[in-house]
């Protein structure tokens, strides 16, 4: 990408999709939550016309790092918390039994810096960056930078403390 940050490979039209992409994620909406509008396809012929296509990158794990003014204020890892009948096991969201948890998760310094850089590049003071880690390539990839992450519990307290600290 233009900023030099590691994102999953992406494009905006079907015609741009490289032949070597074995699985393609189609994102029907760029504004949403919980995986709304995401479908995964194995051939370009069955693709809907959408705003964004990405290569499906296999993940060892997924995490969310919350950044405020250039520093991490919270971090979570996505865990399967309940079994449900999944339509597509490649999509990890609340509907398929996956949620962000703390579980004493300590993020890798590389992922923290990538999240800091992502928030800075998009020009935000704060944001929650969703990342995946691929063990085979020993690589983190940015999935998205959330400008209005769901805030509750400890995460909400961490944001409140960050904002109060910034005012003092």
Model-predicted segments: where are they?
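Active-site nucleotide/adenylate-binding loops and adjacent lid/helix of ATP-dependent enzymes
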Residues: 1-74, 101, 105-113, 166-168
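Short, internal acidic amphipathic alpha-helical interface segments
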Residues: 107-125
């Amino acid at each position: 990408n233009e900023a030099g940050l590691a994102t999953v490979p992406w494009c905006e039209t079907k015609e741009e999709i490289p032949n070597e992409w074995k699985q393609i994620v189609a994102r029907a909406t760029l504004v949403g939550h919980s995986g709304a509008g995401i479908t995964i396809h194995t051939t370009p012929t069955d693709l809907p016309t959408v705003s964004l296509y990405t290569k499906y990158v296999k993940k060892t794990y997924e995490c969310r790092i919350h950044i405020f003014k250039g520093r991490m204020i919270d971090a979570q890892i996505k865990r399967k918390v309940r079994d449900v009948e999944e339509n597509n096991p490649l999509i990890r969201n609340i509907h398929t039994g996956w949620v962000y948890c703390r579980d004493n998760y300590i993020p890798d310094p590389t992922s923290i810096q990538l999240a800091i850089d992502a928030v800075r590049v998009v020009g935000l003071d704060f944001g929650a960056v969703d990342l995946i880690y691929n063990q085979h390539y020993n690589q983190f990839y940015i999935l998205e930078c959330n400008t209005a992450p769901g805030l509750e519990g400890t995460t909400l307290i961490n944001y409140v403390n960050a904002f109060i600290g910034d005012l003092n």
